[in-house]
Amino acid sequence: MNDQRKGDHAEPTTHFGYQDVPESQKAKKVAEVFHSVAAKYDLMNDVLSGGMHRLWKRFTIELSGVRAGNRVLDIAGGTGDLAAKFSRLVGPTGQVVLADINESMLKVGRDRLLDRGVAGNIEFVQADAEKLPFPDNHFDCVTIAFGLRNVTHKDEAIRSMLRVLKPGGRLLVLEFSKPTNKLMSKAYDAYSFAFMPLAGKLITNDSESYRYLAESIRMHPDQETLKAMMVEAGFDRVTYHNMTSGIVAVHRGIKP
C-alpha cells in the first residue's frame, strides 16, 4: 500500500493492478471485474491454466486435513470448486460456508452447486474477508483460493481469518506467486500480458479484467513475504509449497 498523501486530508492509496487508486475505490473496482467475468469464470480458469487449477486445488484440499464433522469456511469461494469437495469430506455432520464479497460470483456458485445437488451442508454468505461476520474460534479450517490478492488490506483479512479459526485450526492460502525459475518467469510474463487479455477478449469480450488479473498477480506478496505476514498475524508453523515452478503457492498456518 502507498500511504503517501497529496495533502493533509488526502485518502491513502493502494494498488489496483499497476494503478494507484484511493483505498475506498479498490473494492468497487474489483467488484466490477468479477461482475464482468462471473458467468464464464470456470471456463476461463480451464483455458488460462490448461486445467491445472484443478490439481492446485486438489493439493490444497489434501493439505487441509479436513475430515467428517468439521466446519470449513471457504473465502472468495466463487463458483464453489473447493466448497463442493469439502462438502463431501465433512459429510452430513459437518458444515461448509462458501463466502464471497461479490454477489455475482456467489450467485453463480450457489446455482452451480444446487444444480449438482451437493449444497445440502453448504451455507452461502456474502462477506468481506477483512471483516468476517462469524464468531471467534468457530471453524476447523479456513481456505482462500485465488482471492487474497484482490483484498485491499491483506493483513486485516489474515487477522480476521485467525480470529474465526478454532485453536489448532488451519488456514490455507492458495494464490499465484513468484516463479522460482528465471526462464519460467520470462515465459510466464509473456503469457500473462499477451495471451491472457487476448483470451479474455475472445471468450468474455473483456480484455481489461484479464489485464488486471495479470497485473494483480505481480503486485501480490511473494512466498516469503506472505509467510511473514501470516506469522505476524499470529499463525504458527507457517509453511508453503510451490507448484508449477512457483507460479502458484499454497501457504498453510496453524492457529495456536
Curated annotation (Swiss-Prot):
SUPFAM superfamilies: S-adenosyl-L-methionine-dependent methyltransferases
Top EC class, one word: transferase
EC number(s) given by UniProt: 2.1.1.163, 2.1.1.201
Any Gene Ontology biological process: methylation
Matches recorded under Gene3D superfamilies: Vaccinia Virus protein VP39
Signal peptide: none
Residues where S-adenosyl-L-methionine binds: T79, D100, D128, A129
UniProt KW keywords: Menaquinone biosynthesis, Methyltransferase, S-adenosyl-L-methionine, Transferase, Ubiquinone biosynthesis
Bias kind Basic and acidic residues: ranges: 1-12
InterPro entries attached to this UniProt entry: SAM-dependent_MTases_sf, UbiE/COQ5_MeTrFase, UbiE/COQ5_MeTrFase_CS
Intrachain S-S bonds: none
One Pfam family per UniProt: Ubie_methyltran
Family membership: Belongs to the class I-like SAM-binding methyltransferase superfamily. MenG/UbiE family.
Keyword Hydrolase: no
Protein name: Ubiquinone/menaquinone biosynthesis C-methyltransferase UbiE
Sequence segments annotated as region (Disordered): 1-22
